[in-house]
């Protein structure tokens, strides 16, 4: 019911990418065939099929982040806690992961609680809470806005507050 995406990946070094992802399913009494099907599907969606047999030391930071993300969302959790989930990703990989988050949210109503300093990443949310010095100082909702319009609102709030993005999101 709960998925975690850590900023520093937390993959097990002695397991392949495939095995790291499978860990989340292996405790759920799911058949090996179903586990394999789900891993292959998420691997394709996050563009990690070619690294499934690699160990973490053989992967780039972005690949590790995508494997860790796959492990967190493969169980279709009701809540995903994500700490800078796109921090180690290039723009293409970030978009793929954020689209997966959107898909989970829309299809099975998964809540994604994400910490980010990136306005682009935040623009995929339906609600953004700005925290400064440990206190909530603003909140905006996407509503019916397009992602571009919501992105512009995020930038406007940061600009109005007189800080840079690293201070506000």
Q: For each predicted feature, which ranges?
A:
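ABC family nucleotide-binding domain
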Residues: 1-130
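Short, charged, intrinsically disordered terminal tails
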Residues: 164-165
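Conserved beta-strand-loop-alpha-helix hinge in the C-terminal portion
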Residues: 135-160
């Amino acid at each position: 019911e709960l998925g975690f995406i850590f900023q520093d990946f937390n993959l097990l070094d002695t397991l392949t990418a495939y095995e790291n992802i499978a860990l989340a399913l292996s405790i759920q009494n799911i058949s090996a065939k179903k586990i394999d099907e789900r891993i292959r599907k998420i691997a394709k969606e996050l563009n990690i099929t070619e690294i499934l047999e690699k160990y973490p030391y053989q992967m780039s930071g972005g690949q590790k982040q995508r494997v860790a993300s796959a492990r967190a969302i493969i169980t279709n959790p009701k809540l995903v806690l994500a700490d800078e989930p796109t921090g180690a990703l290039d723009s293409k990989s970030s978009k793929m992961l954020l689209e997966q988050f959107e898909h989970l949210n829309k299809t099975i109503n998964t809540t994604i609680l994400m910490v980010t300093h990136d306005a682009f990443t935040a623009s995929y949310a339906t609600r953004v809470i700005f925290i400064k010095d440990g206190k909530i100082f603003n909140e905006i909702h996407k509503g019916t806005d397009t992602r571009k319009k919501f992105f512009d609102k995020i930038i406007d709030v940061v600009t109005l507050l007189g800080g840079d993005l690293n201070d506000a999101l």
